[in-house]
Amino acid sequence: MSALANRFVTKMNGLGNAIVVLDLRGTGIVISAAEARAIGQGKGLHFDQLMVLHDPLSPGSAAFMRIYNIDGSLAGACGNGTRCVAWTLLREDHRIGAELMLETAAGQLACLKLAEDRFSVDMGKPAFAWDAIPLAHPVPDTNAVDLARDLAVLPPVDPDALRKASMVNMGNPHAVLFVADQDACDLALVGPVLEHHPLFPDRANISIATVVSPDHIVLKVWERGAGATLACGSAACATLVAAVRHGLAAREARISLPGGDLTIAWRAADDHVIMTGPVTFEFTTRLDPSLFQALVA
């Protein structure tokens, strides 16, 4: 029988971004891509991201998180999922202002409880160097990258936006395209092409953004390994940063995604990006042993 059989998982969402939290602290278990995919087949457990908690690597941290997409691939960051993990670990601590530190492969994330269902997360500093994003080769300016190059057929999106895409790493690689008309861009057609663009050796998250005003941006996101999602916290962070770099937005703005709004602030004092938004608890259940039968046969 799989070591994951009958273990409890918590299903949550952050602005509709489907999250499953699995606490494996104290077990030494590291799940495989196939096991992550199997969990997503459980009743009601289809996820955009699976947040797996392990023993912390650093003193003062509550947990080390491995983050899986629904296809079993690993993600470097998930802002909505991090808020859900913070809610899970601070569930019995009703103090407003309660804090905890979480770790990922991309670094430490400080979480702050603002209300029972609202948290902020310090997502760290954005990276802009071509090899930090990463890109397949150097480019003159990561804030204006021509993604039309190397594509035999251009996806249905504003050509000017495609030729001036902004690259940001917020734990994950992000490409942000600013368009005047969201409805003119079919994300289901644009997202897969750009996610697998030859410039992105690790694939990329694709953000299609419209700046309504300096403090309001409308955004839809194609996540690598997950597809179109109702919300993506790291993409919201990357989009605000890209908008500031383009001179289109203030350093704090409301980012409106299909699932709702996030508040993103890029602090001038230390360059850290702070994401604030809600979480919603759905249910807790046990993992059905039958999910893993094909994997241990």
From Swiss-Prot:
Q: What is its EC number?
A: 5.1.1.7
Record carries keyword Amino-acid biosynthesis? yes
Example GO molecular function: diaminopimelate epimerase activity
Q: In which pathway does it act?
A: Amino-acid biosynthesis; L-lysine biosynthesis via DAP pathway; DL-2,6-diaminopimelate from LL-2,6-diaminopimelate: step 1/1
Q: Which residues form a coiled coil?
A: none
User: Where are the disulfide bridges?
Assistant: none
The top EC class is isomerase
Catalytically driven reaction(s): (2S,6S)-2,6-diaminopimelate = meso-2,6-diaminopimelate
At which positions is substrate bound?
17, 49, 69, 79-80, 172, 205, 223-224, 233-234
Q: Which UniProt keywords apply?
A: Amino-acid biosynthesis, Cytoplasm, Isomerase, Lysine biosynthesis
Query: Which function does this protein serve?
Result: Catalyzes the stereoinversion of LL-2,6-diaminopimelate (L,L-DAP) to meso-diaminopimelate (meso-DAP), a precursor of L-lysine and an essential component of the bacterial peptidoglycan.
This chain belongs to the protein called Diaminopimelate epimerase
Organism (species) = Beijerinckia indica subsp. indica (strain ATCC 9039 / DSM 1715 / NCIMB 8712)
| Taxonomic path | Bacteria, Pseudomonadati, Pseudomonadota, Alphaproteobacteria, Hyphomicrobiales
**Gene name of the record:** dapF
